[in-house]
């Protein structure tokens, strides 16, 4: 399994707009792609403009195929296009150790 962590810094006071873009535009496009497992948007408690978007994929090839499509809706750059001033940094990880399975959270955690 493969995980992608995207660190996102929203412009001051714009995290609600960021959350809406991710929940309504970005994640629906990404979740329809082959190999997608789940995604979680984490909002930092002590810094209201800082977020982490964690995505889980079957393997690294699945996310690389997504990035190669060039489809803007499936690209994290769609957020930058719709929310000027946002800062985005991505990192990828191969998951070597895991315990637990809570897939239902992927359906309900965005509210």
Q: What do these predicted ranges mean?
A:
Residues 15-16, 26, 30, 46-47:
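Alpha-helical interaction segments
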Residues 24-25, 29-37, 56-91:
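An amphipathic, aromatic/His-enriched active-site/gating alpha helix that lines ligand/cofactor pockets
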Residues 1-3, 18, 34-35:
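Short, flexible segments with low predicted structural confidence
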Residues 2-8, 38-69:
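Short, well-ordered beta-strand segments in beta-rich or mixed alpha/beta enzyme
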Residues 14-16, 61-63, 98:
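Residue-level signal for secondary-structure boundary sites
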Residues 9-22:
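Short, surface-exposed ligand-recognition loops at beta-strand->loop->(often short) alpha-helix junctions
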Residues 2, 9, 40-49, 74-111:
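Glycine-rich beta-strand-turn "strand-cap" elements at beta-sheet edges
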């Amino acid at each position: 399994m493969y995980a992608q962590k995207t660190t996102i810094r929203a412009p001051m006071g714009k995290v609600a707009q960021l959350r809406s873009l991710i929940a309504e535009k970005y994640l629906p496009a990404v979740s329809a792609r082959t190999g997608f497992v789940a995604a979680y948007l984490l909002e930092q408690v002590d810094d209201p403009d800082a977020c982490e978007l964690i995505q889980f994929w079957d393997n690294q090839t699945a996310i690389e195929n997504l990035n190669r499509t060039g489809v803007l809706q499936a690209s994290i750059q769609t957020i930058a296009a719709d929310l000027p001033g946002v800062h985005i940094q991505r990192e990828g990880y191969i998951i070597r150790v895991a315990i637990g399975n809570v897939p239902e959270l992927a359906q309900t955690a965005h509210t």
